């Protein structure tokens, strides 16, 4: 272990923190909006659709009571996750078959891009003897995304544990699995509202910006450095 740290463990959010869902032009090829004028799904529309697929909190379209119920529970049940996001994409103007095609990319671990410093951070923490966990509000198994990227000690996924950030229960599950205390744990995420919930238990918290991967080369390294964990 290289030096001492005030932390025994670091918890990471997934989307917008370790990885980002970044569109490929092929995903939108042949798509048009399901409106009277059949508008083009241009770069601006693509960016907004991706934002709506990945925003950690809040909602971006009008919802019926049934759709709202699915939205509120989306990270607990895969079928509700599908229902909620297909509703968002349909309300955003996509035909159903286009909405289903785009949604299929969102839940495919192979479609998620790691931030440039994710491998360095995961490897560096392991070498220092600092335990790691991914704590994510999600309704699909993201573990395959880490193949060839890095090793994580524990995955605490909302749909598997029945709790959603910022509920302290999901963070406590991570602490228990790692065998660490909140006082010696850092949570890193892109949502002050959701990820910052770890502070309720006494964890430290580092906020990162969910920028495109090409624009955030060392955000994780900087966040750890600011909390006394140089890599």
Residue ranges and their predicted role:
Residues 1-12, 20-22, 94-97, 119, ...:
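Asp-based, Mg2+/Mn2+-dependent phosphohydrolase catalytic module
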Residues 3-116, 128:
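N-terminal helical cap/lid subdomain that shapes the substrate entry/recognition surface
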